[in-house]
Amino acid sequence: MELSKVTLEIFSKLEQKWLSHCETSKKTRILSIDGGGTTGIVAGAALLHLEQQIRLQTGDSDAQIADFFDIVAGTGIGAILAAMITADDGSGRPLYTAKDAVHVITEKNSELYKPKTTGVFCRRRRLSSRSMDSVLKQVLQRREDGKLLTLKDTCKPLLIPCFDLKSSAPFVFSRAGASESPSFNFELWKVCRATTATPSLFKPFHFTSVDGKTSCSAVDGGLVMNNPTAAAVTHVLHNKRDFPTVNGVEDLLVLSLGNGASSGTQARKICDNGECSTSCVVDIAADGVSETIDQMLGNAFCWNHTDYVRIQAMGLGRTREEVLKERGLESLAFGGKRLLKESNEERIDSFVQRLVASGKSSLPPSPCKHSAVTPLAVAEAR
């Protein structure tokens, strides 16, 4: 009897300690932005409202999204947005606010996705790679000296996937890899160009790292990781150097931004006769990847679903305002989705409350701000 009482007291204290740890420990914050489409309306609407709410709830008119997230991931058009809001302006601050980034994408969209001049008998629609290259170089360079920024030149860890035809496997660009070796450091415009090389619209993009030792023949990252959230979660869980306090998903706070889900009507219409265009197949694959990842993460965070928030639009909203007013969707643990009472706008508001309560990110700035000595060199010196 006495033993049972002692055991109960021990477990009660352990439970209190665990609950106290869950309440007080600072979670690692992940922002993930889907690929898909060329306008980024859903992600753009969410980013604008996210930044607006951060500034409103902190009372800081200069606060930016990168201040409150520990890592940002993006694919396709989402990768361009992710790179813009994390690129270092040279003083340790983001090169673009979310408002500026969305404005640039909107203003230069016709140049990013400019139709390529083709012959009279060419039936396949292609986009101009030269035009996209020019815009990306212009956008992802330092304003003062025109320096083309690299993965190391980011104020927060960045993660962007593509599919490498040379190795027939996904290739994930990261600041962590870039800081370890110049062979894994790539210019940001090339990284964004790689993840947006949709097979039906662009030819594969061939490029090398800054030291010329690593080469890649890339196509759209959306084919394998249109929703890069799982890649970001895995990266954080296995990167103890940058995220030493993370032991499991219970230590994470995740915001995943979709880029609009197809209703499927158009795809069925095109494919009913047994013929599918390349673009149709790519869209179906990308949507399938995004939904699968969302379902997996819904299961992983089922014990505390408020730690994982997915913002998506079901093809109904055509403007940013309509996207934010749509009711949110939540993946259920054993399949299916539930329509929530809260709108996408309200869900972002609630998420920002938790962000602000946990304070600004305490991760170190861009590796380029420090000595050129790598962690490996430091370890060897010891």
Predicted features along the sequence, with ranges:
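Conserved catalytic cores and adjacent C-terminal regulatory segments
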Residues: 1-382
